Amino acid sequence: VDFTNRMIDVFGDQQASLVPALGDFFDGFRDLALDASSRVRRDQLLSSASTVTARFRELADRLSAFDLESKEALETKVEQFNELLAQLSLVNAKLIKVQDLSKQPPDLLDLKDNLLRDLSSYAKLVVKEESNGSVVVGLGSFDRKLLEKAEFGRLDIKTSSDRGSSIQLELSY
Protein backbone atom coordinates (compact mmCIF):
# COMPACT_ATOMS: atom_id res chain seq x y z
CA VAL A 1 0.00 0.00 0.00
CA ASP A 2 2.83 2.39 0.88
CA PHE A 3 4.56 1.81 -2.46
CA THR A 4 1.27 2.24 -4.34
CA ASN A 5 0.54 5.55 -2.63
CA ARG A 6 4.03 6.78 -3.38
CA MET A 7 3.67 5.79 -7.05
CA ILE A 8 0.39 7.70 -7.24
CA ASP A 9 2.15 10.72 -5.73
CA VAL A 10 4.92 10.51 -8.34
CA PHE A 11 2.60 10.21 -11.33
CA GLY A 12 0.14 12.73 -9.93
CA ASP A 13 2.83 15.34 -9.30
CA GLN A 14 2.33 18.27 -11.70
CA GLN A 15 6.08 18.88 -11.83
CA ALA A 16 6.75 15.32 -13.04
CA SER A 17 3.56 14.81 -15.02
CA LEU A 18 3.88 13.94 -18.67
CA VAL A 19 0.52 15.41 -19.68
CA PRO A 20 1.49 19.10 -19.80
CA ALA A 21 4.91 18.30 -21.27
CA LEU A 22 3.40 16.13 -24.02
CA GLY A 23 0.75 18.80 -24.68
CA ASP A 24 3.44 21.44 -25.13
CA PHE A 25 5.43 19.07 -27.33
CA PHE A 26 2.54 18.37 -29.72
CA ASP A 27 1.47 22.01 -29.66
CA GLY A 28 5.01 22.81 -30.79
CA PHE A 29 4.60 20.49 -33.79
CA ARG A 30 1.28 22.11 -34.66
CA ASP A 31 2.79 25.59 -34.40
CA LEU A 32 5.80 24.56 -36.49
CA ALA A 33 3.48 23.10 -39.15
CA LEU A 34 1.83 26.52 -39.44
CA ASP A 35 5.16 28.23 -40.03
CA ALA A 36 7.86 25.68 -40.90
CA SER A 37 10.48 28.33 -41.60
CA SER A 38 10.24 29.93 -38.15
CA ARG A 39 13.47 29.53 -36.20
CA VAL A 40 11.69 30.49 -32.95
CA ARG A 41 9.09 27.75 -33.37
CA ARG A 42 11.79 25.17 -34.10
CA ASP A 43 13.64 26.18 -30.96
CA GLN A 44 10.41 25.99 -28.96
CA LEU A 45 9.77 22.49 -30.30
CA LEU A 46 13.31 21.40 -29.42
CA SER A 47 12.89 22.85 -25.94
CA SER A 48 9.60 21.03 -25.39
CA ALA A 49 11.19 17.80 -26.72
CA SER A 50 13.98 18.21 -24.16
CA THR A 51 11.39 18.73 -21.42
CA VAL A 52 9.50 15.55 -22.41
CA THR A 53 12.76 13.60 -22.51
CA ALA A 54 13.75 14.89 -19.08
CA ARG A 55 10.34 13.96 -17.64
CA PHE A 56 10.57 10.43 -19.05
CA ARG A 57 14.07 10.04 -17.59
CA GLU A 58 12.94 11.34 -14.20
CA LEU A 59 9.98 8.95 -14.12
CA ALA A 60 12.20 6.05 -15.23
CA ASP A 61 14.68 6.86 -12.45
CA ARG A 62 11.90 6.99 -9.87
CA LEU A 63 10.42 3.71 -11.09
CA SER A 64 13.85 2.06 -10.92
CA ALA A 65 14.26 3.31 -7.37
CA PHE A 66 10.81 1.97 -6.44
CA ASP A 67 11.68 -1.36 -8.03
CA LEU A 68 14.89 -1.68 -6.04
CA GLU A 69 13.27 -0.53 -2.81
CA SER A 70 10.34 -2.93 -3.16
CA LYS A 71 12.66 -5.87 -3.88
CA GLU A 72 14.73 -5.04 -0.81
CA ALA A 73 11.58 -4.79 1.32
CA LEU A 74 10.37 -8.16 0.00
CA GLU A 75 13.75 -9.77 0.72
CA THR A 76 13.61 -8.45 4.28
CA LYS A 77 10.08 -9.80 4.80
CA VAL A 78 10.98 -13.21 3.38
CA GLU A 79 14.05 -13.41 5.61
CA GLN A 80 11.99 -12.49 8.68
CA PHE A 81 9.41 -15.12 7.72
CA ASN A 82 12.14 -17.76 7.34
CA GLU A 83 13.63 -16.85 10.73
CA LEU A 84 10.25 -17.24 12.44
CA LEU A 85 9.70 -20.56 10.69
CA ALA A 86 13.12 -21.80 11.83
CA GLN A 87 12.28 -20.82 15.41
CA LEU A 88 8.96 -22.64 15.16
CA SER A 89 10.72 -25.78 13.91
CA LEU A 90 12.91 -25.73 17.03
CA VAL A 91 9.82 -25.39 19.21
CA ASN A 92 8.16 -28.22 17.29
CA ALA A 93 11.22 -30.43 17.83
CA LYS A 94 10.89 -29.92 21.59
CA LEU A 95 7.13 -30.54 21.53
CA ILE A 96 7.56 -33.80 19.60
CA LYS A 97 9.70 -35.24 22.40
CA VAL A 98 6.71 -35.26 24.78
CA GLN A 99 3.65 -37.22 23.61
CA ASP A 100 1.09 -35.85 26.09
CA LEU A 101 -0.13 -32.30 25.52
CA SER A 102 -0.93 -31.87 29.23
CA LYS A 103 2.76 -32.45 30.06
CA GLN A 104 4.05 -29.82 27.66
CA PRO A 105 5.61 -26.72 29.26
CA PRO A 106 3.08 -23.86 29.05
CA ASP A 107 5.76 -21.34 28.07
CA LEU A 108 6.72 -23.54 25.12
CA LEU A 109 3.09 -23.72 23.99
CA ASP A 110 2.80 -19.94 24.38
CA LEU A 111 5.96 -19.45 22.33
CA LYS A 112 4.51 -21.70 19.60
CA ASP A 113 1.29 -19.66 19.56
CA ASN A 114 3.21 -16.37 19.40
CA LEU A 115 5.37 -17.61 16.53
CA LEU A 116 2.29 -18.80 14.64
CA ARG A 117 0.62 -15.42 15.16
CA ASP A 118 3.72 -13.61 13.92
CA LEU A 119 4.03 -15.91 10.89
CA SER A 120 0.37 -15.41 10.01
CA SER A 121 0.99 -11.67 9.69
CA TYR A 122 3.16 -12.44 6.63
CA ALA A 123 1.05 -15.04 4.81
CA LYS A 124 -2.15 -17.03 4.92
CA LEU A 125 -1.34 -20.19 6.85
CA VAL A 126 -3.15 -23.44 7.45
CA VAL A 127 -2.25 -24.95 10.82
CA LYS A 128 -3.01 -28.45 12.04
CA GLU A 129 -2.22 -29.11 15.69
CA GLU A 130 -1.13 -32.62 16.59
CA SER A 131 -2.15 -34.37 19.82
CA ASN A 132 1.18 -33.50 21.46
CA GLY A 133 0.86 -29.78 20.65
CA SER A 134 3.26 -29.79 17.71
CA VAL A 135 1.98 -28.30 14.48
CA VAL A 136 1.95 -28.93 10.77
CA VAL A 137 1.94 -25.62 8.92
CA GLY A 138 0.94 -25.14 5.32
CA LEU A 139 1.15 -22.09 3.10
CA GLY A 140 -2.35 -21.37 1.88
CA SER A 141 -3.17 -25.07 1.85
CA PHE A 142 -1.55 -28.31 2.88
CA ASP A 143 -0.24 -29.07 -0.59
CA ARG A 144 2.57 -26.62 0.27
CA LYS A 145 3.78 -27.70 3.70
CA LEU A 146 6.11 -25.24 5.37
CA LEU A 147 6.65 -27.18 8.58
CA GLU A 148 6.09 -30.76 9.65
CA LYS A 149 7.69 -32.18 12.78
CA ALA A 150 11.09 -30.44 12.89
CA GLU A 151 11.46 -30.23 9.10
CA PHE A 152 10.72 -26.87 7.52
CA GLY A 153 10.90 -25.31 4.11
CA ARG A 154 12.61 -22.08 3.31
CA LEU A 155 11.13 -19.41 1.07
CA ASP A 156 13.52 -18.01 -1.50
CA ILE A 157 13.11 -15.18 -3.96
CA LYS A 158 13.83 -15.95 -7.60
CA THR A 159 14.02 -13.16 -10.13
CA SER A 160 13.95 -13.42 -13.88
CA SER A 161 14.28 -10.75 -16.49
CA ASP A 162 12.67 -12.57 -19.41
CA ARG A 163 9.59 -10.30 -19.19
CA GLY A 164 10.90 -7.20 -17.56
CA SER A 165 11.54 -7.98 -13.94
CA SER A 166 9.61 -10.94 -12.56
CA ILE A 167 9.77 -12.12 -8.95
CA GLN A 168 8.69 -15.55 -7.72
CA LEU A 169 8.74 -17.13 -4.30
CA GLU A 170 10.04 -20.70 -4.18
CA LEU A 171 9.78 -23.16 -1.33
CA SER A 172 12.80 -25.40 -0.81
CA TYR A 173 13.69 -27.96 1.86
Language model: regions and residue ranges:
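Phosphate-proximal small/polar/acidic motifs at interfaces that engage nucleotide phosphates
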Residues: 1, 87-90, 96-173
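Alpha-helical heptad-repeat coiled-coil segments that mediate oligomerization/polymerization in large
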Residues: 1-7, 14, 18, 38-45, ...
